[in-house]
Amino acid sequence: MSFLGALNLTGFCDAIDVSKVQRVVDPDAVRKAGFLAAWAKASEGLGYCDPLVQQHLKDLSSAGLIISVYAFARVQQGNPSEQAKKALSCAGNTYQTRVMLDLESAPKDWGSVQLCDFAEEFFQGLDEEGAGDGTFYTYTSFLQERLHPEIARRVKLIAKPLHLAEYKSLTTSWAPTSSSDLRRHTGPWKDWTLLQYSGNAGYQVPGIVGDCDRNLFRGTYADLLAFFGLPPEGTEVDQGGIIHGTDIIDDLLDSRKLGPFG
């Protein structure tokens, strides 16, 4: 088992995603290792809530990470808009912008039209709840083999930021060392916004017990704040003074009453 902190590649931000499989034993260590954002699994299909989602959100946000949640789609259960609302319900009164649709599996008889319809209705469910713009997560192989050809015709879906999962190895630890290691086939998207480059058998994340998915966000920290609808560093707030870094997040969470953070 080998631990590795954030990559800190120029022009990128490091992030993680977690579920009940991981134990976040030291959230401060996660932040000190350089990770800036996290997605916690909220739900799976219509009936399942991850039992640790709210604890993960509370712990990671208190350490200074920007947080959101993801919903693992179970397309055979139908009702995609309700699956979106289930994720929000499981997350509770927490910061919910950039909720992620995790669409990576489906019965073999589901075609690309049916899958794209599901995805569009999921994001519509987020819109109905005022949850902000969502993010589309999938694997390269699922994108190419299951979502094509219909995805190329779905302007609304292509407008969603793409969180692409593609690993160089499933058996040994690997991490990119330069931007040339990050090129992926993303059509019909111009490029990925987030890349999950490591999961099981990857490098361990400081402060977390168990394999943990590692991600890169394309952009600077200022871009990451803007992505989540947060103001730039140094923004003056009504309470007085100038706030810096992730202090912005705590202030906004308090003012919007979006989370049980203390």
Predicted regions, residues:
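Functionally critical loop-and-helix segments that line ligand-binding/catalytic clefts
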Residues: 2-19, 153-262
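Substrate-binding cleft of extracellular glycoside hydrolase catalytic domains
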Residues: 3-133
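Short, solvent-exposed polar/charged micro-motifs at secondary-structure junctions
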Residues: 26, 110, 146-147, 204-206
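Positions that flank functional sites
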Residues: 45, 75, 141-142, 202
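Alpha-helix initiation/capping motif
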Residues: 50, 139-140, 213, 220
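Noncatalytic linker/hinge segments flanking ATPase motor cores
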Residues: 59-60, 77-78, 110-111, 138-145, ...
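Intrinsically disordered, low-complexity segments enriched in small/polar residues
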Residues: 68, 135-137, 219
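Catalytic domains of cell-wall/extracellular-matrix polysaccharide-remodeling enzymes
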Residues: 98-182
